[in-house]
Regions:
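Low-complexity, disordered linker/stalk regions enriched in Pro/Thr/Ser/Gly
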Residues: 1-281
Length: 281
């Protein structure tokens, strides 16, 4: 029996770019005279079945269906192939398609039409979204996270993937990698299948800058590539305190009134060459 070759994906989404991969399970054969010829045909469901959530029923009223597009017949010797790919199909985006196979043995006897499951054809890549690098995992779940300019960790990069979408076959996976300031990759590509919070393991150096590159794939195997908007600098060292003094010592001669909440006051100077000083307490 014929079926679509889903490669681990949903069977309704594997057709793209005018080709359809078919898995005939154990193949079609005749133990006496062998399979000498296979006829194939392509069927397109009516417009009432448009959309991925409306698959047609297994069989139609007329069998085999009257509206079939014949495909080139194929000569075989003894046994039909278990897997094959049919190219240059005139398929319609967003419509359900299936292939029917008819086998003829060595003495001309014809097997019944064997249909594959219906496959929704998706010929468009996903809608590009945004890859936002954040400093903490909590920031990834905020309503409108801002792009980080610096991060202190060298072992992980936290990010959230927003607004990636595919109306036809849906989002399948995200292939993530880091690229340096020169555009060359600085990490291996890894695959994730979620987008709210991604914890990407890396090995970064102090002062190393990077961007995130995303290849977003839908279930039909089509993809869109996105690079994060900002370049992030790794700052793995704390700020430097250059001067600490209490008022009243050295050149600072001030009269202070002690109170219950004030014992002494200090002055300090701090700087950070990489990411700057964000706050003083």
């Amino acid at each position: 029996r014929a079926r679509t070759l889903g490669e681990g994906h949903m069977s309704w989404a594997h057709a793209n770019a005018g080709r359809l991969a078919i898995d005939f399970n154990q193949g079609l054969w005749d133990e006496h005279t062998g399979m000498q010829r296979m006829n194939y045909a392509l069927e397109v469901a009516g417009t009432e079945f448009s959309g991925w959530n409306k698959p047609p029923p297994g069989k139609r009223d007329a069998w085999p269906p009257a509206q079939l597009t014949p495909l080139p017949w194929v000569e075989h010797e003894g046994r039909a192939p278990t897997k094959m790919t049919i190219y240059n199909l005139n398929m319609t985006h967003g419509r359900w398609h299936r292939v029917l196979a008819e086998g003829i043995n060595g003495v001309g006897l014809v097997a019944e039409w064997c249909p594959s499951p219906w496959v929704l054809v998706d010929l468009t890549p996903p809608t590009a979204g945004r890859a936002i690098i954040v400093r903490t995992s909590d920031e990834a779940f905020s309503g409108n996270p801002s792009d980080a300019l610096f991060q202190s960790r060298t072992d992980f990069v936290y990010m959230t993937l927003r607004d990636f979408d595919d109306e036809e076959s849906g989002m399948f996976a995200f292939q993530i990698s880091l690229i340096g300031a020169d555009g060359w990759p600085i990490s291996l590509e890894q695959q994730v299948q979620h987008s709210s919070l991604v914890q990407f393991p890396v090995s970064l150096r102090h002062r190393q800058s990077f961007r995130v590159k995303i290849r977003a794939q839908n279930y039909a195997g089509l993809e869109v590539t996105v690079t994060s908007a900002t370049q992030v600098v790794t700052d793995a060292t704390p700020p430097v305190l250059s001067h600490v003094s209490d008022f009243g010592l050295g050149e600072y001669e001030l009269d202070l009134i002690k109170g219950p909440d004030l014992d002494w006051v200090v002055m300090w100077e701090a700087y950070d060459e990489e990411s700057g000083v964000e706050d003083l307490e």
